[in-house]
Amino acid sequence: MIESIEKYKKLLNEATNNNGDWKSPYENLMRELYKLPVIFFALSRDNYDETNKKSTPLISTKDFNGTPALYVFSDVDLASKWMIGYRHTTDDLKYGLIGAINKEPHDFLYVFQMARALGAQKIMLDEGGDWVGIDINYFMEVNSISTKQVSMLLTAEQAKEVIADNKPPTVRFFPISLIPLK
């Protein structure tokens, strides 16, 4: 699957450079990204829980002229190189501030829905390699991800509290375990 991601990134780059049809490879790239069995996310240094080695997905404004973006990687090796290159690691250098979310059993669609609800407008895909900026609304449209609701993973206890309080839960990312650096 990662080969198809690279293929569509290359086709998109060629189309963009030659003023060709960029829409088809762009949409196919978005579909292939969403088909991956696991996606890697840069995690926030600000929300890092040192005791549990967890953090939440990073939304950064360092690229796209300050536009908030969710940092996503299709490959763990590329993500690890990015973490080391930017020193986006724990202080002891044992972990990169990177986490993996499997498509199954919970599906990672909630991360994209949550990121959009929290203000992300872009997806920075594979920074540090042949990166691509993806419009998050377009990504959700192409992959039939609802923009009208947000899927949230709640524990049974959290669900009981929401029902008892009769108000919606706070929209927030859930902590993701860090991956040890190789």
Language-model-detected regions and their locations in the chain:
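An interfacial alpha-helical scaffold signature
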Residues: 1-182
